Amino acid sequence: MVTVEQLAARREAIAGSPDLTALARHIAARNARVLERLPLVPEVKALLSVDGGRCPDDGRALVFDPWSPDEHTCPACGRRHAGVRHHRAWAKFQHLWLAERAVELAALAALGNDPGSAAARSAEILCTYGDRYFGYPNRDNVLGPSRLFFSTYLESIWILNYLGAAALLREAGALDDATARAVHTVADEAANLIGEYDEGFSNRQTWNNAALCAIAVWFEDEDLARRAIQSETGLVAHLRGYRDDGLWYE
């Protein structure tokens, strides 16, 4: 995990680098609208279906717009579509997008010039999921247990950004007790979900192991870290999948 000293060093590096300063401005611009108002946090879990998220006329994937939860545009014909299946397909990308916003806002709070508003919005996203996480049902899954999605590895990708945001806020001194409790709640349940579904020697299991490592660091759980890294299906075992040709094989 990042430390206070590392954050201070990065702030100095950003201040002294035109490229890093430009990158910081780009990230700030990308999140400007989120700072103005909180995007909709879906009240539903994502659903994988044959027709959800696709144009019924030409089969093209509908455009993801985080600010349009109910109307979804086909990039080919321009028609707008609505309905439960389209909304739940949209929810997959929205959940992932919100976690990305949370961690980028936390980075702005830890490294930027205007930390207050970015930290507050990031914490608001974390707390909202803390309040709702157990309300997302662990059902209608395709590959393993999940509350927000239909596959465990997606939950793993999501929790990595979620915990990344929390860790940055904590080291920046911007993680209040209520937000910390929300993060604890989500991380504990995510560990149970992800930990019970081992996909063996699989590319998806690398995401699961990475997520369990992040959770282990958050809770300072050495046993969980050891399992995610050193078990028969841990990260080290997956690294052995690299062959002499540089490719990785399941």
What residue spans do the PLM features occupy?
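Extracellular glycan-targeting catalytic surfaces
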Residues: 1-199, 206, 210
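Extracellular polysaccharide-recognition and catalytic grooves
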Residues: 181-250
